[in-house]
Each structure stands twice: as C-alpha cells, then as structure tokens.
C-alpha cells in the first residue's frame, strides 16, 4: 500500500490532524530531544503525520515515530525570500535522513532552484512532495506539475500584514479543483480545523496552537490583560 493510501486510511480513522513540531527559534523547547518528545506525544495522541523542520530535529524524531514525517529545512537567504527547502541539496539531505514527504516553497518568487527541479529531485529519491503555497495560482500550478499535495501554508505570509483567520476560501477553491489540499496556517482552534475539513481539506496542519508554548501563553495573556485592565482604566 502506498504512503498516501496509508494516510488516507489514517485520516478516515483519526480525523486528519498533522502536528507541526517547530518550536520558536531560541526557545527552551528548541532542542532536538524535546522536539522528538513532542512528536512522539503527538503521534500517541492521534496525529496522522508530523511536520518537522531541520535535519537535527528530523534525525531525532525519525527513530521514535511510525507515522509519516513531512520534513523541510528553513533558510534565510540574502538573494531570495524563499525559506522553505530552497536548495536541491536540502532535498537530498532530508531524504537520506528519513523524510517520507518533503515540503518545498511552491510560490513563484525568485529562488535558487526552480519548483520543477525540486519536485523532480524529491521524486527521484522516492519521496512524496508537498508544495507550500500562498495563492490559488501557486497551488494549481504545483498540482499540475505533479506535487502529491499542496498546502495553504504561505497564504497571508508573502505580503505585508498577516490575517488573523485561516484562509478557508483557498482550501475550498483547491478542493473544488481536485487538489489534495493540506490546510495550514493560523488554524488555532479545533473549530477552525474542523471547518477546513468541511471545506474539503484532505488534512489540517496545526503548529502554534499545539507546540509553541510562547504563542499560546501570549494569547492567554492578551485576553487576561484585556479583562483585568480594560481600555478605559489604562
């Protein structure tokens, strides 16, 4: 049975939650052993797959879990805004470290390696490919190229001003176009994740609301401060 067929079965049984274990950089949780522990806990709690960034984290996670791992490498390049798995060398390294699915930036922005060449490299390694996209056009182009899944990962993150709500309209449009779509980006409540599935998502990736303690504490602190110190008393 193919990996995607296995995932289809897990999604039907467990519900389609992919957990992204990517701590805030520099956080006390930003440690491969801790990332691996979070990943194992997520698997035991019913995650159908995991999203892991960085070779060290992937190498720590892979021996502990049996669910598929979506892996990527983030880089800050001086000559390109693309951060997610920008180099062909990254694809090869992730494949050798045990990634099942390799995620790359699927936008049309200036980049060191073309989207098509990254896709070809992933498939040469016998891995499934995920395109992290920002728009309907990006995602449809990647799907037509032959990506195994497209994510709404970068919707709202490639221009000024990040929306608060997830892009459910993009999920719905991609599903209607026949894409295997992973809803990702700002799914901070179970209700939002469930709505994405109702809009046709194949699965939903949740990161900050599960694995970024600083973000979760920030949400609670903001709400509590507003309750304790209303604007008219500040």
Swiss-Prot record:
One of the GO BP terms on file: carbohydrate metabolic process
EC code: 5.1.3.9
Keyword Isomerase included in the entry's annotation: yes
Domain of life: Bacteria
Keywords: Carbohydrate metabolism, Isomerase
Reaction catalyzed: an N-acyl-D-glucosamine 6-phosphate = an N-acyl-D-mannosamine 6-phosphate
Entry-linked SUPFAM superfamilies: Ribulose-phoshate binding barrel
Entry keyword Isomerase: yes
Gene Ontology terms, MF aspect: N-acylglucosamine-6-phosphate 2-epimerase activity
GO terms for cellular component: cytosol
InterPro entries linked: Aldolase_TIM (IPR013785), NanE (IPR007260), RibuloseP-bd_barrel (IPR011060)
Protein family per UniProt: Belongs to the NanE family.
Function of the molecule: Converts N-acetylmannosamine-6-phosphate (ManNAc-6-P) to N-acetylglucosamine-6-phosphate (GlcNAc-6-P).
Entry-linked NCBIfam families: PRK01130.1
Protein name per Swiss-Prot or TrEMBL: Putative N-acetylmannosamine-6-phosphate 2-epimerase
Species assigned in the record: Klebsiella pneumoniae (strain 342)
Record gene name: nanE
């Amino acid at each position: 049975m193919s990996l995607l067929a296995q995932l289809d079965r897990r999604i039907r049984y467990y519900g389609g939650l992919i957990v992204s274990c990517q701590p805030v950089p520099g956080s006390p949780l930003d440690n491969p052993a801790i990332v691996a522990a979070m990943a194992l806990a997520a698997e035991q709690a019913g995650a159908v797959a995991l999203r892991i960034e960085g070779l060290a984290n992937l190498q720590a996670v892979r021996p502990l879990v049996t669910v598929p791992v979506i892996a990527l490498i983030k880089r800050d390049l001086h000559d390109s805004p693309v951060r997610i798995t920008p180099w062909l060398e990254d694809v090869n390294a992730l494949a050798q470290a045990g990634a099942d699915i390799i995620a790359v930036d699927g936008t049309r922005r200036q980049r060191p390696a073309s989207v098509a060449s990254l896709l070809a490299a992933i498939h040469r390694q016998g891995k499934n490919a995920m395109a992290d996209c920002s728009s309907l056009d990006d995602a449809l182009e990647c799907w037509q190229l032959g990506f195994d899944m497209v994510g709404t990962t970068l919707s709202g993150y490639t221009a000024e001003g990040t929306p608060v709500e997830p892009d459910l309209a993009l999920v719905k449009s991609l599903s209607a176009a026949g894409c295997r779509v992973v809803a990702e980006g700002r799914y901070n409540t179970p209700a939002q994740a469930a709505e994405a599935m109702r809009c046709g998502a194949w699965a939903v990736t949740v990161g900050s609301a599960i694995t970024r303690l600083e973000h979760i504490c920030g949400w609670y602190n903001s709400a509590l401060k507003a309750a304790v110190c209303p604007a008219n008393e500040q």
